[in-house]
Swiss-Prot record:
Stretch forming the signal peptide: 1-22
Bilayer topology annotation: Multi-pass membrane protein
Subunit structure: Mostly monomeric, it may also form dimers. Interacts with SpoIIIAE. Forms a complex with the F(1)F(0) ATP synthase in which can be found the alpha, beta, gamma, delta and epsilon subunits of F(1) and a, b and subunits of F(0). YqgA is found in the same complex.
InterPro entries registered for this protein in UniProt: YidC/ALB3/OXA1/COX18, YidC/Oxa/ALB_C, YidC/YidC1/YidC2_Firmicutes, YidC_ALB_C
Homology family: Belongs to the OXA1/ALB3/YidC family. Type 2 subfamily.
Traits of the deletion mutant: Essential for sporulation, disruption affects the expression of prespore-specific genes but not early mother-cell-specific genes, i.e. cells do not progress beyond stage III of sporulation. A double spoIIIJ-yqjG deletion is lethal. Genetic competence increases about 20-fold in the single disruption.
Gene Ontology CC annotations of this record: plasma membrane
Name of the protein described by the UniProt record: Membrane protein insertase MisCA
Species of origin: Bacillus subtilis (strain 168)
Length: 261
C-alpha cells in the first residue's frame, strides 16, 4: 500500500513536470524571448550556463556539457544523500514490516486497515517518513528535465563537435549509447547492492533501464548521450562513496522469498 502511494505520488509529479516541459517542443531553439514559464526560468538559464562555460573552455561545448553536468550533480548531491539515507532507514525496517505482513496476512479490509495502522506506528516509533525518499527526487526532476531541454534546444551545441562525434548528430560508432547503457546498469547494481531483499520489479528494472537508455541514446544527438554517460559515471562514484560499506558487507542482494544460506 505504501509503495503504491509512493509510486502514485512520483507518477503524479512526473506528469506535472512533463506537462510543463511539454508546453514547448525540444525542436524549438531556446532564446531569451521564449514565452513559456518553463523555458524562461528553467531551460534558458541552463542553456546560458552551458554557453558561458563553453566560452570559458575555448568554445568547447562538449567539455561544457561535461562540466555543467558534474556541477549540477554536485549541487543536487545533498538531495541524493538524503534520499539514500531514507531508503536505508526503510530497508532496516523491512524485517519488522515483513513480520507485520505475515501477522496480518488476511486480505479483508479490517485486517488490512490494522496492518496499515501498525505499519504507520512502526514508522513513527523509529522516526521514519515513508515519503521522505520521494521529495528529493521531485526536487531533482525539474532540474534534470530542464538540463535535457537545454542541451537539445541550445542551437550552438548542434554546430560543434567533440572527440569523434558531432554533438548535434547521432554517435556514428554507437560508443556513447553502449557506455551509457553499461553505466546505467552498473549504477543500478550498486544502488541495489547491500539490500537484504530484492523484489522482482527491481530485478526487472535492472535490465530494462539500460536497454531503454541504449535505444534512446542511439536515436538522439550525441550531446544528450554524452550527458547520460557523464551523469551515470558521476552517480556510480557517488553511490560507491555513500554506500561503500554496505556494498562490501553484502555485495549480492538476496531475492525476496529466497532461502537463507
Amino acid at each position: 500500500m505504501l509503495l503504491k502511494r509512493r509510486i502514485g505520488l512520483l507518477l503524479s509529479m512526473v506528469g506535472v513536470f512533463m506537462l510543463l516541459a511539454g508546453c514547448s517542443s525540444v525542436k524549438e531553439p531556446i532564446t531569451a524571448d521564449s514565452p513559456h514559464f518553463w523555458d524562461k526560468y528553467v531551460v534558458y538559464p541552463l542553456s546560458e550556463l552551458i554557453t558561458y562555460v563553453a566560452k570559458l573552455t575555448g568554445d568547447n561545448y562538449g567539455l561544457s556539457i561535461i562540466l555543467v553536468t558534474i556541477l549540477i550533480r554536485l549541487l543536487i548531491l545533498p538531495l541524493m544523500i538524503k534520499q539514500l539515507r531514507s531508503s536505508k532507514a526503510m530497508q532496516a525496517l523491512q524485517p519488522e514490516m515483513q513480520k507485520l505482513k505475515e501477522k496480518y496476512s488476511s486480505k479483508d479490509q479490517k485486517t488490512q486497515q490494522k496492518l496499515q495502522q501498525e505499519t504507520m506506528a512502526l514508522f513513527q516509533k523509529h522516526g521514519v517518513n515513508p515519503l521522505a525518499g520521494c521529495f528529493p527526487i521531485l526536487i531533482q526532476m525539474p532540474i534534470l528535465i530542464g538540463f535535457y531541454h537545454a542541451i537539445m534546444r541550445t542551437q550552438a551545441i548542434s554546430e560543434h563537435s567533440f572527440l569523434w562525434f558531432d554533438l548535434g548528430e547521432k554517435d556514428p560508432y554507437y560508443i556513447l549509447p553502449i557506455v551509457a547503457g553499461v553505466a546505467t546498469f552498473v549504477q543500478q547494481k550498486l544502488m541495489m547492492a547491500g539490500n537484504a531483499q530484492q523484489n522482482p520489479q527491481m530485478a526487472m528494472m535492472l535490465w530494462i533501464m539500460p536497454i531503454m537508455i541504449i535505444v534512446f541514446a542511439i536515436n538522439f544527438p550525441a550531446a544528450l548521450s554524452l550527458y547520460w554517460v557523464v551523469g551515470n559515471l558521476f552517480m556510480i562514484a557517488q553511490t560507491f562513496l555513500i554506500k561503500g560499506p554496505d556494498i562490501k558487507k553484502n555485495p549480492e542482494p538476496q531475492k525476496a522469498g529466497g532461502k537463507k544460506k
